[in-house]
């Protein structure tokens, strides 16, 4: 049997009045919109005043796992296994944010990606960030982060054997409310694993080889010819290169270009499966192209300037390289963060000083 709405609310308020001081009564009274049966209106606790009225920078959800499918014209869709972090700012006048709206927006945008309305993974986060501003009318700032993995089909260099590689993808968007249209900055990045060969140890081994060959009375020109064809041994590292580019929402950066730049900036690419000819090719290529961790970062920066000439000067570039040492217990690391304009100025300065 249904209990009459007014009698229940009045009864509860009478009980509360006996325990709550008079000056606090108006804020704590139960609103008349309370309904007992499910599916009817209930008080919106998130919209009430908090006990401590302090603004919060980020409120939201983390580690929302989703399967992201992005349609491509005349190609198979790209599938990403993704983790989302979604945040809004919260004014001190509200007790909490309505977190269920975050899930609703993510699902809506993911469906748009499947339908082909969101055609690029680079734009996914910016669309979510914009929609969050619409749903959270109290928020002035929204932020969306997406960390994903997807499989890239590859072919080995000699035997042309098919194999796959896992690439980590990072995307982020921040939307800020203005009196007109929201201002959105977005970023897209990737982390790729490759191989590096140490130039220092290789130079030491080269000097030793020259001494041994000279002691065997090998002619100097033959020694030089041999060392030119067969690079000396050195120790190797498994390198992890990271490149992220932050741009305005109306700009576009191809994820495929970022991945290619990272691969080409280490001593050699690596493959899950290698036949003997492939293995020889990869090892030889790496030792003919020795690089320090610092070299990798500088090479990435140079390639970014060559590949993305159309980007505005305030585009922010973040480059990181971690090399896992084979003969040491530590890892080598280098990093650079700069705008396109700053990198362009530095490279031009180097070229004019000579």
Can you say where each PLM-predicted feature lies in the sequence?
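Acidic, Ala/Val/Gly-enriched low-complexity intrinsically disordered segments
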Residues: 8-10
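N-terminal intrinsically disordered, cationic/polar leader segments
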Residues: 12-16, 20-354
């Amino acid at each position: 049997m249904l209990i009459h709405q007014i009698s229940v609310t009045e009864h509860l308020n009478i009980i509360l009045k006996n325990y709550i001081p008079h000056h606090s009564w108006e804020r704590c009274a139960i609103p008349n919109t309370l309904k007992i049966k499910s599916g009817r209106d209930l008080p919106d606790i998130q919209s009430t005043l908090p006990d401590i009225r302090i603004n919060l920078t980020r409120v939201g959800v983390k580690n929302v796992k989703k399967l992201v499918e992005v349609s491509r014209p005349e190609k198979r869709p790209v599938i990403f296994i993704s983790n989302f972090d979604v945040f809004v700012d919260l004014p001190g006048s509200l007790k909490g944010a309505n977190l269920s709206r975050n899930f609703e927006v993510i699902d809506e945008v993911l469906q748009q990606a499947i339908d082909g309305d969101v055609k690029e993974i680079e734009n996914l986060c910016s669309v979510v960030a914009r929609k969050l501003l619409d749903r959270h009318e109290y928020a002035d700032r929204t932020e969306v982060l997406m960390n994903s993995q997807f499989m890239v089909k590859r072919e080995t260099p000699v035997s042309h054997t098919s194999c796959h590689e896992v690439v980590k993808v990072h995307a982020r968007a921040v939307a800020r409310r203005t009196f007109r249209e929201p201002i959105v900055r977005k970023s897209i990045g990737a982390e790729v694993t490759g191989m590096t060969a140490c130039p220092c140890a290789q130079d030491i081994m080269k000097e030793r080889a020259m001494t041994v060959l000279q002691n065997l009375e090998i002619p100097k020109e033959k020694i030089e010819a041999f060392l030119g064809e067969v690079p000396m041994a050195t120790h190797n590292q498994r390198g992890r290169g990271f490149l992220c580019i932050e741009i305005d929402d109306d700009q576009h950066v191809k994820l495929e270009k970022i991945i290619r730049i990272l691969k080409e900036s280490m001593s050699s690419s690596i493959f899950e499966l290698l036949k003997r000819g492939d293995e020889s090719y990869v090892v030889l290529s790496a030792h003919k192209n020795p690089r320090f961790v610092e070299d990798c970062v500088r090479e990435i920066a140079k390639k970014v300037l060559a590949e993305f000439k159309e980007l505005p000067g305030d585009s922010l570039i973040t480059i990181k390289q971690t090399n896992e040492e084979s003969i040491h217990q530590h890892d080598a690391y280098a990093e650079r963060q700069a705008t396109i304009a700053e990198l362009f100025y530095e490279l031009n300065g180097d070229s004019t000083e000579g």
